[in-house]
A protein has these predicted regions:
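Beta1/beta-strand and adjacent pyrophosphate-binding region of the FAD-binding site
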Residues: 42-55
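Core beta-strand elements of the Rossmann-like FAD/NAD(P) dinucleotide-binding domain
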Residues: 43-45, 189-200
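Conserved beta-strand-loop-beta-strand element in the redox core of flavoprotein oxidoreductases
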Residues: 167-195
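Conserved N-terminal/central alpha/beta ligand/cofactor-binding core
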Residues: 61-165, 169, 192, 204-224, ...
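Extended, charge-enriched "interface" segments that sit outside catalytic cores
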Residues: 482, 488, 499-667, 671-674
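An anion/pyrophosphate-binding glycine-rich loop and adjacent beta-alpha core
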Residues: 76, 235-372, 464, 469-554, ...
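Internal hydrophobic alpha-helix adjacent to the cofactor/substrate pocket in enzyme cavities
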Residues: 430-451
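A glycine-rich dinucleotide-binding beta-alpha-beta segment and adjacent secondary-structure elements
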Residues: 358-422, 452-465, 589-643, 648
């Protein structure tokens, strides 16, 4: 019946031995639904998003906002954008991504502000390029808020089910750039037997593809603790020619706060003046913040943990997937840093109305009894009770070099991948990919140009370019060190960089447009005032001496004075009444003052990075033919020919970033394709 429904020319699904075949009732789609059913459910959509995690939610919201009739299919409508691991958003580089998502009209920043219980700006002691916002969130409210957004988004419908295969047709276009063995997506099929037709499909399956959870020697199928697993999709995609791999991640035990002696722990408070993620004026900073707590492991704790190593699936060969380098389990840390007698643990609240705490730094798949015994030896945890143990999870992913920069697959037209299916880790990285996939799927259906962010435009651009150009051999997470143009990609200027693009796309609300125009106008207005204002030495020397810098010998422009270390606009307002009046009369808020100061102080560095970025962009303007036979170019090294043939870069700039392609290889391409 399913094969009849798939339609002429559609590919049959590959069979899998997992799970065993079982007889089950299915919803027949042989006859059209009744009039009553038609009112409740439409079976044809422009775009279908599979998966309701952080990537899926952003993808569905963006696609619908751009006018596509969109269906979001999720296994559990009670867990939209569920915080499966730590109850926090942001952090180093990740916070910049969230600000960029917000500037582009996404929802993650707004929902984080709405549900935050603590906010901190990390790396304040470093330069502004390193400042990274991070917020603890109320886990339950975060998911509930996403559900409210989705249920109130025009053009978006939701369906609770599990997709087990896709439906495709073989490409027959004689003028297509695609090879003859490639396909075009036509829809999805679910385990309930429903066939949904679609012009584009976005897969955001997270850790659910053949997910297998481990605690000690016990294992169970599932994409997350308490949830089911998705079978069939990996096997089906592989039957179309996709390459799949296996990765691993993990999560720590959840702690009952009532069993913890908090007097033995060191509280970690939020900022006194908390900022926020969203640039929208209606999005407010957190109030009534809740502290996190710092505690340390000991040598005794480590000895107990080592007792369980023989039963650890990480060390006994049970787990084959590759784990995240930068978020290791506690047993990984003990083996890698065997000389350390102590490791930091952070106890993070999961919400305002719960006693559940997340123990950051104690991710583990050791046996339950070992976890409990070790935790009871941590100071303040002597009487600890846990709600659930830590566990590791293995899942399938698809190497992202099989994607274009739009996140569309190279093998199947109008099929997009976003999130952990691409080998990334982290809510923020997933949400960014989902947003970009949703935008690009909509644009393609409207025959509009694709939306691709360059490496000098956004961390999102760095993220996607790294994925599709370099690929991954371990779960990928973003760091500021991955970006060549960190001074251009600051968290404070994400709106100035990206909101004009959101306006052009049609993703920016009227509130966002007005806020952007006001910020841009007032920032420049304040910079102009500072540039034009002359300051006499009698006005300023007292202030300069008070902060330990040399006094003026003659009058100077205020702009030049602000370039000095230790001088700030806030400090200058205490001695220059006209500057203070100008700021208040124009209703210039702290964020605009901060932005103006950064632009002035870092002007030289900003201009230098822009010059370098423009120079590198010339290589991005030299296009490479998608059907070019690199094996015929014998001047290239063998490794370069292999890598270029597999990845098929779109430009020489992209080719230059492929590992294994040398500067000499790039010179060969420049000569062949023309400088």
């Amino acid at each position: 019946k399913d094969s009849q429904q798939a339609g002429r020319g559609e590919k049959e699904p590959a069979h899998t031995a997992r799970p065993p075949e079982r007889k089950r009732r299915t919803i027949s789609t042989d006859r059209p639904p009744s009039a009553r059913a038609r009112k409740k459910m439409t079976y044809e959509y422009d775009i279908i998003v599979v998966g309701g995690g952080h990537a899926g939610c952003e993808a569905a919201a963006a696609a619908a906002k751009l006018g596509a009739q969109t269906l979001l299919i999720t296994m559990d409508m009670g867990k939209f954008a569920n915080m499966s691991c730590n109850p926090a958003v942001g952090g180093v580089a990740k916070g910049q991504i969230v600000r960029e998502i917000d500037a582009l009209g996404g929802h993650m920043g707004i929902i984080t502000d709405r549900t935050a219980i603590q906010f901190r700006m990390l790396n304040r002691s470093k330069g502004s390029a390193m400042w990274s916002p991070r917020a603890q969130c109320d886990k339950a409210r975060f998911s509930e808020s996403w559900r409210q957004v989705l249920e109130n988004t025009e053009n978006l419908r939701i369906w609770q089910d599990t997709v087990d295969r896709l439906t495709v047709e073989k490409r027959t276009d004689s003028d297509s750039e695609l090879s003859e063995n490639q396909y075009i997506i036509t829809g999805v099929h679910t385990v309930m037997g429903v066939l949904f037709k679609a012009r584009a499909v976005i897969l955001t399956n997270g850790t659910f593809l053949n997910g297998l959870m481990h605690t000690g020697r016990a294992s169970a199928p599932g994409g997350r603790g308490g949830d089911g697993v998705s079978y069939g999709l990996t096997e089906y995609l592989c039957s179309l020619g996709f390459e799949a791999g296996r990765m691993k991640t993990g999560t720590p035990a959840r702690i009952d706060g009532r069993s913890v002696d908090f007097t033995a722990l060191e509280p970690q408070y939020g900022d006194e003046k908390p900022a926020k993620f969203s640039f929208l004026p209606s999005s407010k900073s957190v109030i009534n913040q809740i502290p996190c707590y710092l505690v340390h492991t000991t040598a005794e704790v480590h000895d107990i943990l080592r007792e369980g190593f023989a039963d650890s699936p990480l060390f006994n060969g049970t787990i084959q997937g590759i784990g995240p380098r930068y978020c290791p389990s506690i047993e990984d840390k003990l083996r890698t840093f065997a000389d350390k007698d102590s490791h930091q643990l952070f106890l993070e609240p999961e919400g305002r109305e719960t006693n559940e705490y997340y123990l950051n730094g104690f991710s583990s798949s050791l046996p339950l009894d070992v976890q409990i015994k070790a935790l009871s030896k941590v100071r303040g945890f002597e009487k600890v009770h846990i709600y659930r143990p830590g566990y590791a999870i293995e899942y399938d992913y698809f190497p992202p070099t099989q994607l274009k920069h739009t996140l569309e697959t190279k093998r199947v037209d109008n099929l997009y991948f976003a999130g952990q299916i691409n080998g990334t880790t982290g809510y923020e990285e997933a949400a960014a990919q989902g947003l970009m996939a949703g935008i690009n799927a909509s644009l393609k259906l409207q025959d509009k140009a694709p939306f691709v962010l360059a490496r000098d435009e956004a961390y999102i651009g760095v993220l996607i370019d790294d994925l599709v150009t370099k690929g991954v051999d371990e779960p990928y997470r973003m760091f500021t060190s991955r970006a060549e143009y960190r001074i251009l990609l600051r968290q404070d200027n994400a709106d100035l960089r990206l909101t004009p693009k959101a306006i052009e796309l049609g993703l920016a609300s009227s509130e966002r447009r007005e806020a952007f125009e006001r910020t841009n106008r007032l920032t420049q207005h304040l910079i102009d005032f500072i540039r034009q204002r002359s300051v006499g030495k009698e006005e300023i020397n007292g202030y300069l001496q008070s902060i330990g810098t040399n006094p003026l010998e003659q009058g100077r422009k205020l702009y030049d004075i602000l370039l000095r270390n230790g001088v700030s606009i806030e400090g200058l307002t205490t001695v220059l009444s006209d500057l203070n009046s100008f700021i208040h009369e124009n209703d210039i808020d702290e964020e605009i003052v901060e932005e103006a100061e950064i632009q002035i102080k870092y002007r030289g560095y900003i201009e230098r990075e822009r010059f370098i970025a423009e120079k590198m962009r010339r290589l991005e303007n030299i296009r490479l033919r998608p059907d070019f036979d690199y094996n015929a170019l014998t001047s290239l090294t063998i490794e370069a020919r292999q890598k270029l043939s597999r990845i098929k870069p779109q430009t020489i700039g992209q080719a230059s970033r492929i590992p294994g392609v040398s500067p000499a290889d790039i010179n060969v391409l420049l000569i062949f394709f023309g400088r």
